[in-house]
Amino acid sequence: SIDEAFLVLNKYSERSFFLRAEGIKKMIKKWIGIPVSIGIANNKTLSKVANHLAKKDELGSQIVEIINQKQIEISLKVLGVGDIWGIGTRIEKFLQKNNIYTAYDLYRADPRWVRQHLGVVGERTYRELHGEICIPIVERSEPKKQCRVSRSFENYVTSFEELEKRVISYATRASEKIRSDGLQAKKITTFIRSNKFNNNNKQYHAARTYDFISPSNDLFET
C-alpha cells in the first residue's frame, strides 16, 4: 500500500518505542499535514493488528504496542479473524464454519490443523500471531524490468479510431506508472489479440515494438 510502511526499530530500546512513534506522528503531521496511526509489534502481522486497533483509538494517541504475551492475547481477543492481515474472505468464511471467529480463536487452534487446512501461508500467519518472525522486511525492492497495462474490451472494437483511443489511454497509464516509480523505458510494445473464447471468428494477434532513441518516461515520445 502507498499509505503505509514498515520500520525496523532494532537499534532502539523497547522502552523508547512509544516515544519514537510519537515523534514520527508529529513529524508527519508537521511535514505532510495528515494524522497517522502506528502499530508496534515484533513482526509484520502483529504490527498490522496493532495498527488496526490504533486506528480505532480516535480520541487517544493512535499508537498501540503489542510486545509481550499478555498484550498479544488481549489484542487478538477483540479482533475478528477476517481482520488479520492475509486472511481473505474465502478463508474467513472457512474459519467461521470451523468455529474460529476471532484472531484469538485462530491463535488457540491446533498448529497441525492450521497446517493441514490453511497451508504454508496460513501456517506462517499463525506463527506470526505467536510472535515469530516469518515475513521479512524488504528494505529495497528490485527495480522493475517492465511495466504492463492491458485490458479486455467490454464490447467489440471495430474501428481504428476507437482502437487508437484505447492505445493512447493505456500508453498514458503506463507512462504514469513508470514515472511514479522513478523509472524510464527503452522501448514500448503494443499488442492486440482477438477474443480467444470466441470460436466463431478467426483468431488474430499482433504486436509491434518501438525502440526509443534514449530512455524516456514521456508520453509524447511514445
Task: Outline where the language-model segments fall.
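DNA-contacting surface of Y-family translesion DNA polymerases
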Residues: Q96-T222
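Gly/Gly-Pro- and Ser/Thr-rich, intrinsically disordered tail segments characteristic of DNA damage-repair
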Residues: S1-R127
